[in-house]
Amino acid sequence: MRALYWDGHELRVDSHYATAKSTVAGESSEAQMALVKVHLAGICATDLQIFKGYMGFTGVPGHEFVGSVSEGLGEWIGKRVVGEINFGCGRCENCRRDLSRHCPNRRVMGILNADGAFAEYVSVPVANLYAVPDSVSDEEAVFTEPLAAAFEILTQIQLNPGDEVLVLGDGKLGNLCAQVLRLSGARITALGKHADKLALIKKSGVRTVLLNDWQPRLFDVIVEATGSAAGLELALSAVRPRGTLVLKSTIAAAHQVSLAPVVINEINVIGSRCGPFADALDALSAKRVAVTPLIDRVYALADGVSASQHAGRAGAKKILLRP
């Protein structure tokens, strides 16, 4: 099959990559696998970090996808699906506690010891599949994974109408977080560097502020979605005493930061990663969030190298691949 392959040094299109069917056939019966024909896959910031050496991954990247089941349990054949990206072992303490996302032996689609969705087919545990409602287009469904990550915040903290929330970052993740948190009734402000991206967020009814116009003030909750050390420092300066700081993005670069404000101001710091796919699909089906305005361009998989270069440009929105 055709796939976009990362060998640790170079990204290339491989027209004869070993099919994901071999993965389905080779898995133990404990983890029943489905072979999914990929309709669309999204390039995200994590993929771009992988191309810089993050996680030491080699193989087929990609973890945001929508497709249809071509092989697997009969009841799933032909169904349009998305899939949770963490493949737990099913036997450890975390898996037994329904925390497979934190399984120490987990594989992660396109990130850790498992080929991903930048290919014609991807192999996914049946237990990880979610059926896509007919009311949700492929172009919407491909956002399920990052949208679920935004919904994870609402499972971790209690937001009430009138709470003041600041979302730092106007990129794709910041946009989705702002839209989702607005559903809580809290008062959301999005802060970013790009007027055009903030304009997209503003259309959802969220107050926006350009960084150049920022006048420091305090918020009950800060969601850090910039992935930058500067964003983290700003977040620590803007959260009220006994407020909450949600770290939604990974800051890969080494950076010295004083944690004294966390102790002095008794700040609650919460790490936040993957989230509930069912909530994301429900929101997409009910049209409570708008994701298609975030799409910049759709590339053919054969042009995947150019697509990844486009995704890495400053100001780029969501780049999709179509096998």
Give names to the regions the model predicted:
Residues C89-L168:
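NAD(P)H dinucleotide-binding glycine-rich loop of Rossmann-like/cofactor-binding domains
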Residues V136-N212:
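Mid-domain Rossmann-like dinucleotide-binding core that forms the NAD(H)/NADP(H) cofactor-binding site
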